[in-house]
């Protein structure tokens, strides 16, 4: 297979359009899957995607169009360029136009993609096998998977962009069932290379929660002080970010639209001193410091490829500070260019402690395991609905006293920001609903007052 760098050079040198950007992504992934406390499959996946974006002058304006293919060879280059140019001409003048970056170099351009493989599980797999043995002896069934992905992205252009980033990430998701499958719980862990994954901690969490489910407590629908683990916080606020584009807010189409026009930037949304930001230099979750966009969307623009990504405060001290911008939308809204970064971090000033510490602070409430099947109900308030899954626990006097029924919940993350009673320490966490979409998230566990359960 031709190297990504050589392919980009071939395409950009052959391009006859005004400018041309090529985005190549090489991805390898190793995985393990198990069911009934028995390993069922393992494998390695290798993928490449090549996106060619043509920029063409049309009637005094600039148009863009792109095509994406896999397994591109040198012989495919002319047809690929023709298709991208045709797509640009058909699209007409781009409403997200901004001057293209030129002559920007970031990262080790010439280095090869470093593939992952089964060796990444060298420490994890034996520990997992031991957990299987213990679970069989104790009549606990384990289901789940682990995967490790390394993706390398190269962005090159006629105008001199030579950008490269590497994104290694792994995760474990595991469900434990016992007592003829009448009890079920879940645990999820994010990792960079599996050297820091504690199977013992996963085992202990699953066993503790299955034990809690030995006592049943029936509770009615209503509003409860609710402890959300950091992963559930990540699920809620991922959805909030997905509706946080400045253009939609400016045009009156989102929860962040201001009555009478404009956006709610500058409005205090949280009752506590809460920080919510993206930062490529955040030590625990380093991320790319440049924009790489294969397609234009409300969240990004192909015209912004190569633009720098710096720290962006979405909420600062509980005040809405920024919304997601392309350079074109920033000009339209007369606000700063604040591109969406590759990580999201939430922290609460002065907060510390674990999920267990938060339980001790709740007199009468609920402890959730995960949120599931999250859907929008009302975009104007960002009212969401969803289900609880794999364990809801009744907390009384600072202790878990038993498991209760699952609920359908109905609440808004924007509203929840104003009802935070307690917060734990920020930790790298795994959302459950959006685990396949978001991996670089650090969140605290939160206690939300009056969380609506139906």
Predicted regions, residues:
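Active-site bordering "gate/hinge" segments
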Residues: 1-301, 307, 316-317, 397, ...
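Dual-mode signal for accessory low-complexity, basic/Gly-rich regions
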Residues: 261-454
